[in-house]
Amino acid sequence: MWTVTVGLTCLLAMLPEQSGKISIENPRLLYGVPGLPRGSNKFMHGDTFNLAFDIKGVKSDAEGKVSYSLLTEVMVDGRLEFKHESKDIEAIDSLGGNVLPGFTQLNIGLDQPDGKYTVKVTATEKKTKATASVVQEFILSKAELGIVRIRTTGDREEKVPTAIFSTGEDLWLNLSIVGFARDKAKQPNLKITMEIIDSNGKPTVQKPPVAEISKDVAPELDLLPLQFYVSLNRAGKFTVKLKVVDQISGKNSSVDIPLEVSSAK
């Protein structure tokens, strides 16, 4: 089963001319929208597919209004499996120019067959009827233990997604665990670690935070959400290393995420 979210992330001034043609450029996979760059096109069951892109050449009216729609299609082996067309999306081109950073977001079901998928996104600019498309392939791995739905927010309630970080700010790293085993009491036994490595390859703390989950998990829960707090106390480039160990099955899974923090101005 698929669910989809599409929309506009922000407005920027880039191209001064409006030619009547549009294009979709700079497609990128992210951990959330906005989110940190995702370096792999391999996904797991229960994960979220986030594709961001720039729609260039859109035409605004005298008040700076831009109207467009997005069609998202998911195909496997050349066969259309899922299709979603958004309602008209209206944006205000407050800064001028003719580029709209947009996105499509797909929630991958736990029962989705593994294999190779193709996502095609088509943007239609309503005023000129111009269209442009982008295609992104991804691989859905076999169902197993993993860390999914990674996203960064500036608040604990997960209402403020962010991918730009400055010193003095708070960062909440949100994620879910999938594919874990349960004991005779129907409870998991998981150990999740978040280790941060600096640009010199050294851990930032001697004892990284660890979450241990072994009780009070509802029997029907297949996706186990949790979050880690990160205090952005200095600038630099870091790697966040997440690891989950299932102490019942003996399996483990890990993910490395790049993190860059700038000095506050």
Describe each region flagged by the PLM.
Residues W2-A13:
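Bacterial N-terminal signal peptides
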Residues Q18-K265:
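Intrinsically disordered, low-complexity terminal regions enriched in Ser/Thr/Pro/Gly
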